Amino acid sequence: RRNQNSIIAHPLHGVFLKKVSGAQILNNRIQGKTTLAASTDPVEKGIGQSTENCDTTLVANRRGNGIHQWNCEENLICGNEISDARDGIYFSFTNNSRVENNSIHHVRYGLHYMYSDANIFENNTFTENAAGAAIMFSKNMVVRGNRFVSNRGYRAYGLIFQSSDNSRLEQNEISENAVGMSFNQCNQNEVVANRVTRNYIGLRFGSNSDGNRFTENIFTGNLHPIETGASDVSGSLWAVHGVGNLWDTEHELDLNRDGIVDLPHRELDLFGILRRDFPVIAFLSESPAVKLLRFANERAVIPGMGSIEDAAPLTPQFWRIRAQSPNYRTRTALLKNK
């Protein structure tokens, strides 16, 4: 039940696990098949003429997965490097497993979860993929300490959450992606202490997502911090126990110097889903008219505009101030031990 220290080069499929419990896939290097030998068509070549074999590009959707699990329990996938596959690691009806310290690049989805519950993945790196990770129709997940970086393209994402509930995302770096995070039909999730920076869209918030709690996250350097479209986002909290998130803002009124801004932060999504059909509209993001609307929305909610409200936004000094507090150090230690 252990596969380790192997080099698996150019397979159509890498490692396949079916109804396996307690397996360990450790420290392997899996590089998928990117070309496929094909013969020229004898009809096109002409009767009596010799045909030739040539390599054709095997597009990502026609490749197999690097590691594929179906109907498994309690497996460990650790220390692997996976590239040039369809999905790096694919879970289907697989529960109570761990994915740790893997590096996955140049695939479709780095990590793809379907109908798989109570799994933990942490300290993995996902770069140069169509999506770093896609967690779909799953619950009770822990996503901790991962790097979703430079997943770029017209429809590229750092992290996709689709119809997934009661999960925890914490201390992840989500940077330089086309879309940092996407939430759609997701409920009762905790999003804590993640760095969502330098993405084209920081967080795309879809429909029917309620009861999600965002706190201590950093949303800075994103061209568009939030995209809500026509979705109602009032059912989620952007500050928990009086602690919100760090945003790009020019106004940081903190009279008592506790690291929490004294006025709420309202993030306005002016163009919403229009960006998908008309990308050039992004050039208006820093126009004087848009800046004026943002300024007005900070002071009073503009009816009919997509907006989220963080009741307790943070200053950059928040973490330094709280780190000096004994109560905060105790709370941080408890979070790390969860």
PLM segments and residue spans:
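Parallel beta-helix/beta-solenoid
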Residues: 2, 10, 15, 20, ...
